[in-house]
Amino acid sequence: MGIFVLKFGGKTIANVEKMKLAATRVQDCLDSGKQVVVVVSAMGDETDKLIELAATVDGCGYKRELDHLLFTGEVKSAALLTMVLVGMGIKAKSMNFANIGIKTDSEHFNAKVREVDASNIKKLLDEGFVPVIPGYQGMNSDGEVTTLGRGGSDITAVVVASELKAEQCVLFKDVGAIYYDDPKVNENVAKFDQLTYQELYEIVDRGCKVVCRDSIAIAKMNNLVISIANPETFKIGTVIK
């Protein structure tokens, strides 16, 4: 039975209605006979709001404490989406930084993944659950939460998919593909159907923010194929390999 890792970006789960749509995509994969692991970002612009909140107490320089604040956005998303899934009759359990098995260095606010132990994720899959993983976070050697920097939920999805040897790693984004230009500015712009890792590097370096650059390097190292998709249609927009 193949494993699909589905990562939902913040704008694709910005409210409960969008979470219900995300849950139908999970159900679609389960109906096709796949095991599913879900990775979530914080809802909408929650991370920015938390940073702004920290700024009101001049706290942005305290990176350890920022991590303790910011990781809550993804935890909130994971808990709510799990509630939606369970409400639909899907066996699901949310996880957290202490049990997802992502071990990092101690560079708070921009930690690097050092090791992934997916045994707890595999255990839930074997028990018939959909693990719902809060992205963007890991745990250092002192048992403290760390965050992986901007776009870190993409990193979470890619390292988990690589460790599980997933059949698919699908990143659901509000734009649904990689485009030659910003589709929000130019609605007639064409998309890339397929890109190599190197081509995507170059596009990201020119300012594209659809995929986290560090996640591309990890995918390339593990020969992991990444798909960018639209959650409304479940149509794959761009494949990166």
What is the role of each PLM region?
Residues 1-220:
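Nucleotide/pyrophosphate-binding catalytic subdomain
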Residues 41-47, 233-240:
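Terminal amphipathic helices with adjacent charged low-complexity linkers/tails
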Residues 218, 222-236:
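Conserved glycine-bearing catalytic or ligand-binding loops at nucleotide- and phosphate-handling centers
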